[in-house]
């Protein structure tokens, strides 16, 4: 008799994806972030569900309902802070996951990569809308500033913004629809993530060397299940350290002031994980130019497979490209720092230089390094 996990229609799918899946024997801890993102998503859906049971999406009561969750609901404070800081952990894992893909050439799996970019954009949209829900000062003004960017689109811009707002300013209608979208999007993300996994399992995982691992595969269970469990424990440890010892470390104090349309905060800025893109947006004096640069800073990921010039897939044996990759990481950290600073000298200049450097590295320097390395191979 065949094993039930191999014969049962449902168990068979799980078995082929998580148990008997042939995996490369040499994938490092950088390959843990996929499963960690899955854990983050489940955690966010669960904590979010419990928050939604007590939250009200009305401008008059939204702020009070969040306060009520923290003060009066049993363990409401821990659920709220796990959800808020869980978003930060989600983005740390996301950026690590994308960075791993860039470094080891995983973007040559085109379908998997492009669906990954769609996932990134969807998660960013979800996080942005979630930040609006507590209806604090930064929630309100963040929503106003970011949605207003669409007014830079010629001809239809103003109508588009008013359509998204559901009126002539960010108000009751905006908050209600943002809550509706914030609730539904994680489930859509789950569905897209399944497609992401489906395409990955068509080709099998990449590995640090970037060469085919068909000759040396091991079963996913128990080797990588135990490795993923360790990763998950470390993730939860990091999250709980943040939640229990410094819950407001990554938040903005302005969001503890209820939203007031008549009083603009001195420095409007998004959550830390959007600061790099915000810095690129601010570094261009023209509104439409800034919006285009902002969009392109993320959408540039779609072009990465086209910009691959090297004969080698991974950067493991390419010191020049490695150097540029870590320069790009440093550049993104610089942009993140600049995004949180006021718009004044010298931050403006640093931001502009870092923005130019970002596009220059990806579009010019890294493809050039690939070509140079190909030439060096012939020496």
UniProtKB/Swiss-Prot annotation:
Heme b b566 binds at residues 97, 196. Heme b b562 binds at residues 83, 182. GO terms for cellular component: mitochondrial inner membrane; respiratory chain complex III. Its main location: mitochondrion. Its cofactor is heme b. Binds 2 heme b groups non-covalently. The chain crosses the membrane at residues 33-53, 77-98, 113-133, 178-198, 226-246, 288-308, 320-340, 347-367. It is a multi-pass membrane protein. A ubiquinone binds at residue 201. InterPro entries: Cyt_b/b6_C, Cyt_b/b6_C_sf, Cyt_b/b6_N, Cytb/b6-like_sf, Cytochrome_b, Cytochrome_b_C_euk/bac, Cytochrome_b_N_euk/bac, Di-haem_cyt_TM. PROSITE patterns: CYTB_CTER, CYTB_NTER. Pfam families: Cytochrom_B_C, Cytochrome_B. Gene3D superfamilies: Cytochrome Bc1 Complex, Chain C. SUPFAM superfamilies: a domain/subunit of cytochrome bc1 complex (Ubiquinol-cytochrome c reductase), Transmembrane di-heme cytochromes. It is found in: Mitochondrion inner membrane. Keywords: Electron transport, Heme, Iron, Membrane, Metal-binding, Mitochondrion, Mitochondrion inner membrane, Respiratory chain, Transmembrane, Transmembrane helix, Transport, Ubiquinone. It comes from the Eukaryota. GO terms for biological process: mitochondrial electron transport, ubiquinol to cytochrome c. GO terms for molecular function: metal ion binding; ubiquinol-cytochrome-c reductase activity. Coiled coil: none annotated. The cytochrome bc1 complex contains 11 subunits: 3 respiratory subunits (MT-CYB, CYC1 and UQCRFS1), 2 core proteins (UQCRC1 and UQCRC2) and 6 low-molecular weight proteins (UQCRH/QCR6, UQCRB/QCR7, UQCRQ/QCR8, UQCR10/QCR9, UQCR11/QCR10 and a cleavage product of UQCRFS1). This cytochrome bc1 complex then forms a dimer. Belongs to the cytochrome b family. Component of the ubiquinol-cytochrome c reductase complex (complex III or cytochrome b-c1 complex) that is part of the mitochondrial respiratory chain. The b-c1 complex mediates electron transfer from ubiquinol to cytochrome c. Contributes to the generation of a proton gradient across the mitochondrial membrane that is then used for ATP synthesis. Heme 1 (or BL or b562) is low-potential and absorbs at about 562 nm, and heme 2 (or BH or b566) is high-potential and absorbs at about 566 nm. This is Cytochrome b. The gene is MT-CYB.
């Amino acid at each position: 008799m065949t094993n039930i996990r191999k014969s049962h229609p449902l168990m068979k799918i799980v078995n082929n994806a998580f148990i008997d899946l042939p995996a490369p024997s040499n994938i490092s801890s950088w390959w843990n972030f996929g499963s960690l993102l899955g854990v983050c998503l489940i955690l966010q859906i669960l904590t979010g569900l419990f928050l939604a049971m007590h939250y009200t999406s009305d401008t008059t009561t939204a702020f009070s309902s969040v306060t009520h969750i923290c003060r009066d609901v049993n363990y409401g404070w821990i659920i709220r802070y796990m959800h808020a800081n869980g978003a930060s952990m989600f983005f740390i894992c996301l950026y690590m996951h994308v960075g791993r893909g860039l470094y080891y050439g995983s973007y040559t799996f085109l379908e998997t990569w492009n669906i990954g970019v769609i996932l990134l954009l969807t998660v960013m949209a979800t996080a942005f809308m979630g930040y609006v829900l507590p209806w604090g000062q930064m929630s309100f003004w963040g929503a106003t500033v970011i949605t207003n960017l669409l007014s830079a689109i010629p001809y239809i811009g103003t109508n588009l913004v008013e359509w998204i707002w559901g009126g002539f300013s960010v108000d009751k209608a905006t908050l209600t629809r943002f809550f509706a979208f914030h609730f539904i999007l994680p489930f859509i993300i789950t569905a897209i993530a399944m497609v992401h996994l489906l395409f990955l399992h068509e080709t099998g995982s990449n590995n640090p060397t970037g060469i085919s691992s068909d000759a040396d595969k091991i079963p996913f269970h128990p080797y990588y299940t135990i490795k993923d469990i360790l990763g998950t424990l470390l993730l939860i440890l990091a999250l709980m350290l943040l939640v229990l010892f410094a819950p407001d470390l990554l938040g903005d104090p302005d969001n503890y002031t209820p939203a007031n349309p008549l009083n603009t905060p001195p420095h409007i800025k998004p959550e830390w994980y959007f600061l790099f893109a915000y810095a690129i947006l601010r570094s261009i004096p023209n509104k439409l130019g800034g919006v285009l640069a902002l969009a392109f800073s993320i959408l540039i990921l779609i072009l990465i497979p086209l910009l691959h010039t090297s004969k080698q897939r991974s950067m493991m044996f390419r010191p020049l490209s490695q150097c540029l990759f870590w320069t790009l990481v440093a550049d993104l950290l610089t942009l993140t720092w600049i995004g949180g600073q006021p718009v004044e000298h010298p931050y403006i200049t640093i931001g502009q230089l870092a923005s130019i450097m970002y596009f220059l590295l990806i579009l010019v320097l890294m493809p050039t390094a690939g070509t140079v390395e190909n030439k060096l191979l012939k020496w």
